Amino acid sequence: KAPMAEVDILINNASGSSVLMNKGTTFTTTVDGTGYNFLTNEDITITPTSGVYKFSGVNLYEGTLVTFKYTVDSADVDQKFLIKNINADTSTLKVTVQNSVSDSTLNTYTLATGLRNLDNTSKVYFLQETDNGKFEVYFGDGVIGNKLEDGNIVILEYIVTNKDEANGASSFELGSNIGGFSNVTITTKSNAQGGSEAETKESIRFNAPLQYTSQDRAVTATDYESIVKTLYPNALSVSAWGGEDDETPVYGVVKVSIKAASGSTLTE
């Protein structure tokens, strides 16, 4: 998983009715003498407020933005839509499907987190890890999830990261320009944190049965712990308990305590 920092960016001497910061806009930083690139993972547009052009609460991710395209061919029984980089951060993955070479219409597909409420029109994708530690994207069969057609073009965009190496990065400089403007003031609101290695086999062996048992339902304390670990990958450890177990009982509530793997806050 890629480290993420939160910054405010003030555009000095800007003009116009709005300013667009493109997805993939780069920023540079140094940690322990080593340089790293951070970037945005979405397009952001602002309009001036009282003549001030300011991007607030911008999330920056360490790594490089990568794009792969596949053309669907049902005659190829071995075709797979692979994320080819083992250091890819799948939480940054964006999956879009173009109708065909001659039809540039794009549809965005979202990660399916369960099977409930899915039908043959649901534009979702699924993720599974392959034997070599890389990930494969696959789609519905026309019953659960929309089925792709021959000629569709699958576009995978994601960030390849150095994992935890850039945790703690606190000072950033603009690597290029934002909407043609390069005179900026960057204020760091949250140092880079959350960068981590891939989940170990031992952790998967422990957590997988708990996630299967919970079935995306939060009933027992163990269910809550499992779901919270899924929602917050930067959580090193999670403990959940019912309010009735407190020294001063509080009924009808569940309390959760989380220890972050890095930094002092949890990324959303």
Segment roles from a protein language model:
Residues 1-268:
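Signature of Asx- and small-polar-rich beta-strand/turn repeats characteristic
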